């Protein structure tokens, strides 16, 4: 897997964050002890919704990191990359919970943002239940999430729906949807923004606004159990930087959008700006990530996709003590 060199430093973000007081050296640093490592490897999966990780560069430098790398890994492959030791932190979705049950040493640390996924369909299809016997396209969205959404409305996720994924190596699923060759598409930003710009289909589910999905985190930050055990100080400082970056995304979406484009993480400013304005990044302060893990684990269990109880998943695959400390420290 290729390593992408550290992105051009977001110098304007430095002044922006500095003006807001974000880049002051946290007073707790002296009591935390020295960093176990000054290198950190974050994911670049080309999704706009993980913007806080993309703009955490200068915040991480203020925390003492000197070598900040972004590793390219598609959404469905980043958990495997983390387990292989190619990443230090990755984006984790509730639909990935089966990997925790399977024994992968994943530790979910915090929720970062809600929403961002949108389900598009052709005319005549108004609800996910109408997709029985239809074909759905996926680029970045994981198949596991599609199965969960199907099960949530009473469909058999194995027998009642078909899907075409970018990982299959065939035609681009988004283009198949635009051309009318498949009936629906489940997308992460910037895919929904592109479909709207091309006037393709209509939205039948938006996880930012539609219950129950809007009540829980979509993207969470995870690391490996080994990394957290060996680097507790680094773990807390990375999490602090990413959570502060989420606050910046909420406060200055247009300026953050410019930094993401100039940093090479995305190409279309309008798509990025729309995404950042739509996602309520400030919700990390209000929502409980354990509720999210419980919700997804229960739904996966009810759908027959996992056997473990939510309690076991939470016990085996989460560590909230860093977040609890930062919630007290960063209280507005």
Where are these regions (language model features)?
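Short, solvent-exposed loop/beta-turn-alpha elements that line the ligand-binding surface or hinge
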Residues: 64, 209-214, 281-289
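Phosphate-coordinating loops and pocket residues in cytosolic domains that bind phosphorylated ligands
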Residues: 12, 133, 197
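Pocket-lining segment of extracytoplasmic ligand-binding domains
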Residues: 94-95, 171-262
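Short, glycine-/small- and polar/acidic-enriched structural segments
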Residues: 31-179, 183-189, 204-205, 215
